[in-house]
């Protein structure tokens, strides 16, 4: 999508990653190393339908959003509710700041509504402000990867579909939706069993819709669950699920 929306009357500077910017890369000592294999215990979150799309404004690209590009959206008859990258930003802030992530028990994927699949290194520090996050996403969507400042380590990368090629074979895969079967307690999502049993250490995939309105549709999940009597934002759903896994797995 491109355009010169009438509401845009000034050039905006591309907000990218500076060479000395610590915003995107935390000290490795703050994290436990996550060795990914088919049997290792972890929560795998997939943010589906993320509304991450770039738009050309004058001579630069920006992350399309309903606040900054109202003119472009009107010109193209786009619903403001369909351009909410801030939802993905809120979810990623919550997930990557969680104790579960610091303990090395969280893995995150993002798939956009245009079917772009993104993998994010657990050691990535998500930008605090939306403006900086938007600049980073533009960089990622155009260059397909973001690397750490001090090494060749990839912090974010665009990877090949399908998502099932990147998660353990045979693990449980659940989708979250207000219309799903109500679970009395989020902890019911956590694999249960004796600590010495294989089921105790099983990874589990949970899919959350990263959009404001609409129905979450996937072809790889087994069951659809609701975790509240009330509709929840994607970020709150992420928070409740992470907290449940932290409680069961003893992460403090």
Swiss-Prot record:
It is found in: Nucleus, Nucleolus. It comes from the Eukaryota. The keyword Transferase applies. The record marks 84, 125, 128, 132 as: Interaction with substrate rRNA. The record marks 86 as: Stabilizes Arg-84. Signal peptide: none annotated. S-adenosyl-L-methionine binds at residues 176, 209, 214, 227-232. It catalyses: a pseudouridine in rRNA + S-adenosyl-L-methionine = an N(1)-methylpseudouridine in rRNA + S-adenosyl-L-homocysteine + H(+). Belongs to the class IV-like SAM-binding methyltransferase superfamily. RNA methyltransferase NEP1 family. Homodimer. Part of the small subunit (SSU) processome, composed of more than 70 proteins and the RNA chaperone small nucleolar RNA (snoRNA) U3. This is Ribosomal RNA small subunit methyltransferase NEP1. It comes from Drosophila melanogaster (Fruit fly).
């Amino acid at each position: 999508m491109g355009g010169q929306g009438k509401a845009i009357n000034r050039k905006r500077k591309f907000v990218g990653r500076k060479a000395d910017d610590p915003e995107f890369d935390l000290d490795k000592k703050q994290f436990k190393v996550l060795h990914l294999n088919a049997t290792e215990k972890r929560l795998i979150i997939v943010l589906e339908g993320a509304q991450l799309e770039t738009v050309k404004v004058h001579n630069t690209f920006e992350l399309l959003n309903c606040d900054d590009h109202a003119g472009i959206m009107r010109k193209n008859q786009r619903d403001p509710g369909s351009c909410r990258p801030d939802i993905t930003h809120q979810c990623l802030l919550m997930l990557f700041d969680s104790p579960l992530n610091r303990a090395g028990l969280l893995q995150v994927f993002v798939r956009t509504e245009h079917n772009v699949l993104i993998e994010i290194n657990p050691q990535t520090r998500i930008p605090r402000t939306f403006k900086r996050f938007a600049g980073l996403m533009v960089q990622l969507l155009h260059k397909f990867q973001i690397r750490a400042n001090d090494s060749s380590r990839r912090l974010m990368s665009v990877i090949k579909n399908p998502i099932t090629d990147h998660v353990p074979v045979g693990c449980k895969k659940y989708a979250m939706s207000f219309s799903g079967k109500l679970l009395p307690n989020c902890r019911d999502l956590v694999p249960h069993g004796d600590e010495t049993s294989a089921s105790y250490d099983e990874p589990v995939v949970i899919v959350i819709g990263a959009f404001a309105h609409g129905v979450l549709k996937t072809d790889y999940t087994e069951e659809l669950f609701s975790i509240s009597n009330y509709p929840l934002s994607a970020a709150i759903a992420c928070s409740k699920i992470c907290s449940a896994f932290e409680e069961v797995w003893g992460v403090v």
